[in-house]
Amino acid sequence: IAGPIFLPATTMALTFAEFDHTLRDGRVVHVREMRPEDEGEFVQTFDRLSPDARYMRFMRFVKAPDMKRLREVLGSLHEHGFGLVATVPAADGYDIVGSAIYFLGKDPSVCEFATTVDGDFAGAGLGRLVMTTLIAEAKKRGVAVMEGFVLSENKPMLRLAARLGFAIASDPDDRSVSYCT
């Protein structure tokens, strides 16, 4: 999706095929579509993120999850975008250790992405997995252009975006932010 790739929009209902994937370090994650009932697990995921990881993800310091916004996002994905999670088994059922999401803009052929990876899974290939899966799903659903805003100091995400084919430029209005498209 990097760059201006124009695909025909699709109007057919699409389903996401869940799958298991073995990461570079041997751990196995289960990848599936986000669901509204993931709310509690997203709160736990947020709580496990370091303050620096939260800053890199939300582009500002955030002490607690915005529950209203979380419910809005989880409740509107089928109409306005798509999200996926990577999970591992946990004592309470499962933990979300990675996620990627896109939301469509006014032009339904353009979307904005965001991704999060649990710090314990950094460097294992999980970020690449959730992003490549998100990109493939966006293409399948007729998205032509994917874009994202990343803090310029978030070098791991910028390296990943570059390896995935995104063009990266500084935001002319805010040099602390890089624009990936």
Language-model segments: what does each one mean?
Residues 6-181:
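Long, contiguous binding/interaction regions
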